[in-house]
Amino acid sequence: MIIPALDIINGNIVRLYQGSYCMQTNYGEPISLLKEYIRQGAKMIHLVDLDGAKNPLKRQSLLISQLIKEANPLSKIQIGGGIRNASDVEILLESGATRIVLGSIAVTQPKIVKKWFEYFDPNTLVLAVDIHVYSEENRKVAIYGWQKETDLQLEQIIEEYYTVGLKHVICTDISKDGTLLGSNISLYRSICHAWPRIAFQSSGGVNKLSEISKLRSSGVAGIIIGRAFLENTFTINEAISCWQNE
């Protein structure tokens, strides 16, 4: 599945270069673009509330609810940014979101988040893992918008949640995100082979249509694409065709 990404700060779509709030490009208001992405055939949109991710008190709740309503029933919404408790998850699911993305909190408070996997349908929860890749044996998890690197390895965090029914994982190679420098195909091939029952989504760096067929061949269930669509490197329609023709 091709999953367009919309990252939102202060009501506008932005792209951050390698996660830096200081290096952002503004692409205007999100509703018309969301409608255009759906018109082109997007069946799922990946929304990130970057204000909420930075400060839960600044979550853009009204705008997020509006975007979810605009998308339903033609497209599903996968939403992340500032999820801090079970109530946040519940409210978003009740408002019509299909999947809720859990990032840093899944790393810092695993005991609490594992209970969410028992309380909610695990199909509605997505573990987002951002990693620094030093080698195939050394892939360290980063948290808090990539500002802090942990000693935790990628496989450790996946195994932790695999025991409670983990179904969906977004894995981002930090060095690629927002760069249009190409995807880390070997990373996705490796993790899809290691955990065949998990639906992995690749994230970061896609810069040409030929990469889509390579990523699909790696075993990923979805490809999150942000900047390439915003800058018209290729269209959603073209990307979907590449995915379907693989």
UniProtKB/Swiss-Prot annotation:
Its EC number is 5.3.1.16. The lineage of its organism: Bacteria, Pseudomonadati, Pseudomonadota, Gammaproteobacteria, Enterobacterales. One of its GO terms (cellular component) is cytoplasm. Pathway: Amino-acid biosynthesis; L-histidine biosynthesis; L-histidine from 5-phospho-alpha-D-ribose 1-diphosphate: step 4/9. It is an enzyme of class 5 (isomerase). Disulfide bonds: none annotated. Belongs to the HisA/HisF family. It is found in: Cytoplasm. GO terms for molecular function: 1-(5-phosphoribosyl)-5-[(5-phosphoribosylamino)methylideneamino]imidazole-4-carboxamide isomerase activity. The active site is at residues 7, 130. The keyword Cytoplasm applies. Transmembrane segments: none annotated. NCBIfam families: 1-(5-phosphoribosyl)-5-[(5-phosphoribosylamino)methylideneamino]imidazole-4-carboxamide isomerase. It holds the Pfam family His_biosynth. Keywords: Amino-acid biosynthesis, Cytoplasm, Histidine biosynthesis, Isomerase. It catalyses: 1-(5-phospho-beta-D-ribosyl)-5-[(5-phospho-beta-D-ribosylamino)methylideneamino]imidazole-4-carboxamide = 5-[(5-phospho-1-deoxy-D-ribulos-1-ylimino)methylamino]-1-(5-phospho-beta-D-ribosyl)imidazole-4-carboxamide. This is 1-(5-phosphoribosyl)-5-[(5-phosphoribosylamino)methylideneamino] imidazole-4-carboxamide isomerase. GO terms for biological process: L-histidine biosynthetic process; L-tryptophan biosynthetic process. The keyword Nucleotidyltransferase does not apply. It comes from Blochmanniella pennsylvanica (strain BPEN). The gene is hisA.
